[in-house]
């Protein structure tokens, strides 16, 4: 058989190398936000977004929005546009002058989401807050089925799991005592919580999160000394009981102190304390300080707020005895925008020489100055993020996974819709670098396969679980990350009922993923379970049932394909088509050679016959 002319090795291998190059490099990171408000809300994009939660247990997060001072509207996620529809409404018009907060949770342990509202009562003469719980029934709320709590609060309460039964409890100072009280979920009984000489700061930024590295949530309090100096207290959970662990002061430079936030800022697997504030009362000079876990030292991670000759700063909180709109303190909202494993933040900044007020992304980047060398990371204001800088008079900005794809998008509230209501803006994150993530939600574990109506309670908003992972990054180094679930609930904390942990551009399996939950009084053993070889770009739903037998806990894994899956498929199909083309060409050339050889044989036969 004669051989035809074969393509060169370079020609054969070129597309294969091209496909591999595409896979290894991936698309270049792009940073842009696309406004999808009309697609999500239609004409209903107004009201104060107050909380997130899955009310109807369909594995999609719903939005809790306050309107007209006293109405709560629940926008249920839907499969068709507009993707969030106002389906459930409860009103406090007969009780309230102004609803101030919304905290979804399962307050009676029936695995159905209930909703706690705090409000200023009508004709209120002081700043005491009333509270009411609307009880969930059949994956919705019954406006007539509610319980008005028999005590009022000095400030918005912290929702936590005080007794470790995974039914949310209500912590705060009430009209009955100057000492913190706890309303236990389930039987709704009042009990003393702690004995302390400190006064609670108003507005507080208490938190229920593990700060002592034992996978059990501790109690963090923002308090005042007898001389009204700001301080912070950590009450450690020891055997299910809270004992004072440490007390520390604010950074000495700060005059205006904002709300504490918690994040694994430097990616070491431990919680760090972030504190925004100002070094003068008018916030002409703003800063963000960080205290690393266990150090007791404040380190500045952002002090540069100038952009092209314009100085920006935080918006100081103005305390009103009888506010007409929801008070919004100086707050950072935390989320990993670019999935690099280092949490970023959203903040509202004001032009110090004008009146413009905007939302800005604070990106977590490697430290480039001497002041933050200890933590190796710092915040950098992203001044020109397309889409975000078009929204004027912003008052709140937070992260939210709009499309349930593991990428955190942005929601901004801005003034000017009406006198009493604000506009909602939703911005899709078009960050195209093919980074990886794992999305974790820990349920209450009050039931497993025996849940009422066979519906797993995906939407109970469980405070207190702690999550940590270890993996190997793209350079072969060990990488850790951690997060607490629903650690803060007051003053528009707007925390998500799940955690999205960025993994960077490493496609390696998570070597270990740990989940810990609170434990009851008297229980010495830590409630913690480990899972290994978790696939990146997956959602892990953890059901800690039964609570006291971690080895029996179950986890459901749902995969979310990334861009690289499509890229791999395209490259593979391209290589296959090219190989088929080569085979076809070789087959055609071989057929031509065979025909030529047959003609030559026939010609030789005729010649011999002559």
Curated annotation (Swiss-Prot):
Residues 1-32 form the signal peptide. SUPFAM superfamilies: Integrin alpha N-terminal domain. Glycans are attached at residues 35, 123, 138, 145, 150, 175, 241, 351, 369, 480. Pfam families: C2_ITFG1, FG-GAP_3. The keyword Glycoprotein applies. It is found in: Secreted; Membrane. GO terms for cellular component: extracellular region; membrane. PANTHER family: T-CELL IMMUNOMODULATORY PROTEIN, T-CELL IMMUNOMODULATORY PROTEIN HOMOLOG. Interacts with RUVBL1, RUVBL2 and alpha-tubulin. Modulator of T-cell function. Has a protective effect in graft versus host disease model. Belongs to the TIP family. This is T-cell immunomodulatory protein. It comes from Mus musculus (Mouse).
